[in-house]
Amino acid sequence: VERDIKQTQKNRYALSFAAEAAEEYGLTQEVFNPCGKINAAASESGEKHNLEYMGHLKAMGEDSTWLDEEDMKRITGSNYYLSGLLTPKTITIQSAAYIRKFAEGLSRNIDIHENSPVVSLERTGGVWKAITPKGSVTAPKVILSVNGHLQSFGFLKNRLMHIFLYASMTRELSESEVRKLGGEPSWGAAPANPFGSSVRKICGIGGHRI
C-alpha cells in the first residue's frame, strides 16, 4: 500500500503539471477533462476486480464511487455493463490535441523539429549528439520518449516485450442515432478486466462519435 501511495503522489504531480499547462495554453474541456475515470465491468470477473480495487483504494485513503447497472446505463445508454468504479481525481486527455497545443505553447521559447527522426545517438565529450538524416543536435541531456524503440538505441536489450494495440472510431453519428443511443454526451470507460476494451463517446468539433 505504501508503495502505491508514493506512486499516486508522483502521478498527482504529473496531473498537476498537465492541468497547469492546460490552463496556460487555453485547452478546452474536449482536450483536457478532469471528469474522473470509470473502470467498467461487463462480467463477474470484472466486478471482482473492481471490488478488490475499491478495497485497495480505501486502504490508500483514495476516494471512489461504486456505480451499479442502472448508473452505467444512465451514463452509457447501454445495458452491457454490470457495474463500474469511478475514481474522481483522474483526468481524460485527448492526447493528440493535447500534444499539439502543448507544442504550440512551448514553441514560443524553443525550436521544434518535426519530421526529423533521430537515427542514432552518440555521446562524446560529455554531451549527446542526436543524428538525423539531414543534420544533428547536441545537448548535455537527452530524454528518450520512444517506447519500445528504446532497444533500437541500445538500451534494455532483451528486456522489453512489444504489444500492438488498435483503435477504431465511428463516423459522425446522426441526431437520430444519438437519441437512440442515449446516455451522456461524453463518457469514457476503461475495462475492469485487464483484457477488456476501453470505450469512449465524444462530443465536440467532430460531432458525436464512439
Model-derived features with residue positions:
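A short small-residue
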Residues: 1-2, 82, 210
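Dinucleotide-binding Rossmann-like beta1-alpha1 core, especially the glycine-rich loop
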Residues: 1-69
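Generic secondary-structure signature for well-ordered alpha-helical cores
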Residues: 13-27, 59-63, 77, 107-111, ...
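Active-site substrate-recognition segment that forms the wall
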Residues: 16, 24-32, 118-128, 136-210
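Flexible hinge/switch segments at interdomain interfaces of large molecular machines
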Residues: 30, 71-79
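Short, solvent-exposed beta-strand edge segments and adjacent coil->beta transition regions
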Residues: 35-37, 82-84, 165
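Helical element adjacent to the flavin cofactor pocket in flavoenzyme catalytic cores
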Residues: 48, 55-56, 60, 79-141
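General beta-strand structural signal in soluble alpha/beta enzymes
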Residues: 65-68, 112-114, 132, 144, ...
